[in-house]
């Protein structure tokens, strides 16, 4: 092998959802990238629930897509049941979700990775990082060492190890080292990282037993078909991308189920003290649900197919680490599961994660230059959260190599910005998942406008290819044309258009009204307006029609939110120099100094969001920073 085989611009460790998006983003941004994975066959594997999207999560997927990422396109190629959640609510909280064929999804991701220029995949476990210990400057990463002793060099490394760092699986009182069921953990790498100046703790997640769907009685369950018409996930997608569609099903646990669980709690590693890591609040185990909601006589279970050509189903709602004999009993006590055959046991897995307050907004570690962390190792849970972080880390790893400034969206620009800001400012003591409620500017951060918010920035940074840019530009131009067409038309009580509106829509035009403003009426939308002969048929692109309608219907709310953002931005981006001496700010309490020293915010906006930070402390900081700026100018 030539020396060039071992030298890259960026090395990505891990081929999961964070790792694949990181490697793809790095390569799209122009960096020669190496993706190292334990097993090439599991690149893009869905380790837990075979689903993409959902409340808050779908927003992240759309943002990944707007920046040229792979997740949405793979979901379109693999989605076998599609739903728009919160469809009856406002556009800010509507979310796209698909049940995916896990084999089709993995194949789609692997094909995208294989086709990406400047990206090389190599199968190897990483045992250590090569780190240059600086004397006059900070430590910096120089490469990695694999389990077989190979040394790969790169000035940027992205670590996306998922649950593999010192991973430990629990089933009852049985426990053993693993990265996930059937895969070895990254034990040596975890030990090496604990020797470095990182704050490391343990988290836990879990998964339910898998069931042979042919052994279930669907006659006693409720059918849950997908939406019609079918949505798509990618802005480049179309319904014809989807494979054959199937239904999911809904059933419930029984009081017998709960009795079985209560009688076996002493054998649960969650309640025996065997598991130390904290699990996800919003995806609790069935043991947790039975204990925490003791008054409930049943819990809902979503019976979700794992694929079109496999018999296995995923019983969403019964994640468990109880002993296998208890799992079998509780499964067979569920409505429709009396004859159920378990194909794989449920289990809990503990793993190492890093305090994300040790990261910059770029996801570069503060302790080691050029080293980026993304995904579950930052304390998050979920494919979508991991993939979004991976894209950001991969992009910034490439920009680090090229000597370009790091990029990270603000809270008012993207859910990705909310995610990163929450992590690096507040940290987390439990697996963090995204919800729309976490975003204070969610009316601005809708699924439908993720491309308008981010594709321009993605194009400037090399993430967006010509085909996506052409599609995006054409869409934006079509929105502008249609908006201009309708805003140029006026209906009055006496003119022909006013009479047409009254006849076609049953709407009285009592005064001169701009046609576009008619959409503001609660009973009207773009589609109904197009029934007016002079106005229709309108545009045939549903995305264009949606943008025209939302921009008009919510213009007042959007304007007020933009004003609010402008006020907040007055000091939001005021930078705080690296290594800033908070002890030198007269008037800051010791408590506030300690909080600031611990988080080391990069700008005033981040400092404001530190728990316990007072307006007075922020004012003192601003005065000190302004005084220092004037001193430098003088």
From Swiss-Prot:
GO molecular function, one term: flavin adenine dinucleotide binding
Places the protein is found: Cytoplasm
Pfam families given in the database record: GIDA (PF01134), GIDA_C_1st (PF21680), SAM_GIDA_C (PF13932)
Co-factor requirement: FAD
Source domain of life: Bacteria
Residues reported in the UniProt entry to bind NAD(+): 279-293
InterPro entries tied to this protein: FAD/NAD-bd_sf, GIDA_C_N, MnmG, MnmG-rel, MnmG-rel_CS, MnmG_C, MnmG_C_subdom, MnmG_C_subdom_sf
Annotated keywords: Cytoplasm, FAD, Flavoprotein, NAD, tRNA processing
Presence of keyword Cytoplasm: yes
GO biological-process terms attached to the record: tRNA methylation; tRNA wobble uridine modification
GO cellular component: cytosol
Positions bound to FAD: 14-19
Family assignment from sequence similarity: Belongs to the MnmG family.
The protein's role, per its UniProt record: NAD-binding protein involved in the addition of a carboxymethylaminomethyl (cmnm) group at the wobble position (U34) of certain tRNAs, forming tRNA-cmnm(5)s(2)U34.
Subunit structure: Homodimer. Heterotetramer of two MnmE and two MnmG subunits.
HAMAP family noted in UniProt: MnmG_GidA (MF_00129)
Name this protein carries in UniProt: tRNA uridine 5-carboxymethylaminomethyl modification enzyme MnmG
């Amino acid at each position: 092998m030539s020396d060039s085989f071992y030298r890259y611009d960026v090395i990505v460790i891990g081929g999961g959802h964070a790792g694949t998006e990181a490697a793809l983003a790095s390569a799209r941004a122009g960096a020669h990238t190496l993706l190292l994975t334990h097993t090439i066959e599991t690149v893009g594997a869905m380790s837990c629930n075979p689903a993409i999207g959902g409340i808050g999560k779908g927003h992240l997927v759309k943002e990944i897509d707007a920046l040229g990422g792979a997740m949405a396109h793979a979901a379109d190629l693999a989605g076998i049941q599609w739903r728009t959640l919160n469809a009856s609510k406002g556009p800010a909280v509507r979310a796209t979700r698909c049940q995916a064929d896990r084999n089709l999804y993995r194949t789609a991701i692997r094909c995208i990775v294989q086709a990406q220029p400047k990206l090389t995949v190599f199968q190897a476990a990483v045992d250590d990082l090569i780190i240059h210990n600086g004397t006059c400057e900070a430590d910096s990463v120089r490469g990695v060492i694999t389990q077989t002793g190979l040394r790969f060099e790169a000035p940027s490394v992205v670590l996306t190890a998922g649950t593999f760092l010192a991973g430990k699986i629990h089933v009852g009182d049985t426990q053993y080292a693993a990265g996930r069921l059937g895969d070895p953990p990254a034990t040596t790498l975890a030990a090496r990282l604990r020797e470095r100046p990182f704050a490391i703790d343990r988290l836990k997640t879990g998964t339910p037993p898998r069931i042979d769907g042919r052994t279930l009685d669907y006659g006693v369950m409720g059918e849950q078909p997908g939406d019609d018409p079918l949505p798509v996930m990618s802005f480049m997608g179309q319904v014809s991308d989807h494979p054959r569609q199937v239904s999911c099903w809904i059933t419930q646990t029984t009081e017998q189920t709960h009795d079985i669980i209560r009688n076996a709690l002493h054998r649960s590693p969650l309640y025996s003290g065997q598991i130390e890591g904290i699990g996800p609040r919003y995806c609790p185990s069935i043991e947790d649900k039975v204990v925490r909601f003791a008054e409930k006589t049943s819990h809902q279970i979503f019976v979700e197919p794992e694929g079109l050509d496999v018999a296995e189903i995923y019983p969403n709602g019964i994640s468990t680490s109880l002993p296998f004999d208890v799992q079998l009993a509780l499964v067979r006590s569920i409505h429709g599961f009396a004859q159920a055959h378990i194909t794989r046991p449920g289990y809990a897995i503990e793993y190492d994660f890093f305090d994300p307050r040790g990261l910059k907004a770029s996801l570069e570690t503060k302790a080691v230059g050029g080293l980026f962390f993304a995904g579950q190792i930052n304390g998050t849970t979920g494919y979508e959260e991991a993939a979004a972080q991976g894209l950001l880390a991969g992009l910034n790893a490439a920009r680090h190599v090229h000597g370009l400034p790091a990029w990270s969206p603000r809270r008012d620009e993207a859910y990705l910005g909310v995610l990163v800001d929450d992590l690096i400012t507040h940290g987390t003591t439990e697996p963090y998942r995204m919800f729309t409620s976490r975003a204070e500017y969610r009316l601005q951060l809708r699924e439908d406008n993720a491309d308008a918010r981010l594709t321009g920035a993605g194009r400037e940074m090399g993430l967006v290819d010509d085909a996506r840019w052409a599609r995006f530009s054409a869409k934006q131009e079509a929105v502008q044309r249609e908006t201009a067409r309708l805003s140029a038309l006026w209906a009055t009580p006496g003119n022909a258009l006013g009479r047409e509106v009254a006849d076609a829509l049953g709407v009285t035009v009592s005064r001169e009204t701009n046609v576009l403003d008619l959409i503001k009426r609660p009973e009207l939308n773009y589609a109904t307006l197009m029934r007016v002969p002079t106005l229709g048929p309108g545009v045939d692109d549903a995305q264009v029609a949606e943008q025209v309608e939302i921009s008009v219907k919510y213009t007042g709310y959007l304007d007020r939110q933009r004003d609010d953002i402008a006020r907040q931005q007055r000091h939001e981006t005021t930078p705080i120099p690296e290594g800033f001496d908070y002890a030198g700010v007269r008037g800051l309490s010791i408590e506030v100094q300690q909080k600031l020293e611990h988080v080391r915010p990069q700008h005033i906006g981040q400092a404001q969001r530190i728990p316990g930070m007072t307006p007075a402390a922020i004012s003192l900081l601003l005065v000190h920073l302004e005084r220092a700026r004037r001193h430098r100018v003088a």
